[in-house]
Amino acid sequence: EICACLVGSEMCIRDRLYYPLCVLYFFIAFPLYARFAGGKGAAKKLFQHILKPAVTSLGTCSSIATIPANMEAAEEIGIPRDVSDIVLPLGATMHMDGSVFSAILKISFLFGFFGMPFDGIGTYVTALMIAIFSGIAMSGVAGGGFVGEMVIVSLFFPEQMGIAFPVIATIGALVDPPATCINASGDTVASMIVARFVEGKGWFQKKQAERAEKAGA
């Protein structure tokens, strides 16, 4: 495989943890966030309607292209329109937790590729800060990962730019789709959390009760 050929089996094993991490974050962290945001039943409601935004983001690699699907999901979940109208467009350009995951992977991969030790608190803190900064530098459009990759290479490996950028761009093509999925799907979860603080703790139950009353009328 690519990573085994370039940097050896140890680095390859570590990099393979990225995909399980994305899956665990999607199926464990998102329900916990939804539970916090809406209480009982919120996580179930989230997963009834999050599939379309997730698939759209995987197919387009664009958080902005996923906004219509996210708006539809937010409406079905019961998120107030005044919340989703603000949070979802902002989240498409600012909410980049998946991109931070992928940036850490890209940085550690390049360290292994160039034979540099990726260890020590200083290295970890620097990598995390650059990962966050590169996530902010990205836009929500398809291919926005190239901007973040350029930031990583220019800050960490400026003298090896000609070699490092093609390598990190290749890795990015493999890891950016799940990162975008977490970014975009997480925008709906973020809207639920904002709704809790704007509408109050029981907003989700009130919305479901209103819908049940209308359905029974």
Can you say where each PLM-predicted feature lies in the sequence?
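Alpha-helical transmembrane segments of integral membrane proteins
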Residues: 10, 17, 48, 122-126
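Acidic, glycine-rich loop-and-beta core segments that form the ion-binding/anion-interacting portion
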Residues: 14-76
